[in-house]
Amino acid sequence: MVLPALPAPPVCDSQNECVGWLGVAYSAVVDVIRAAAHEGVYIEPEARGRLDALREWIYYNYYTERAKRRDRRRRSVCHARTWFCFRKYDYVRRSIWHDTTTNTISVVSAHSVQ
């Protein structure tokens, strides 16, 4: 697996903790993409599309919720968006892998994903 396993977001409706989790997830995705480019690892187009889509989802939610952090009425919305991003992150993390023999990052076939 390419992306690191992150702990689940906080169970409570704490906006600061949810925004913090989104920030960690965003930096993890960006670091994986940057490290692959730096080390010359080829990312197949389908895997690249999944990583880019995940990066954009987390980026949008992170900066939206960070900007609206002071509005206490958005607490449940922030919590729901964070859990959505966690499920999306976990799905992408399980669906791509790094083949060290060919030095590529590719998508795992659908029937081998658990």
Curated annotation (Swiss-Prot):
Q: Which residues form a coiled coil?
A: none
Is Metal-binding set as a keyword in this record?
no
An example of a Pfam family matching this protein is Adeno_E4
Q: Which GO terms describe its biological process?
A: mRNA processing; RNA splicing
Mutating Y26F: what's the consequence?
Partial loss of phosphorylation ex vivo
Instruction: Report the main location listed first in the record.
Output: host cell
Location of the motif Nuclear localization signal? 66-75
Q: Which UniProt keywords apply?
A: Apoptosis, Early protein, Host cytoplasm, Host nucleus, Host-virus interaction, mRNA processing, mRNA splicing
Among InterPro entries, the record links this protein to: M_adenovirusE4
What family does this chain come from, according to its entry?
Belongs to the adenoviridae E4 ORF4 family.
Please state what the protein is called.
Answer: Early 4 ORF4 protein
Cite the source lineage.
Viruses, Varidnaviria, Bamfordvirae, Preplasmiviricota, Tectiliviricetes
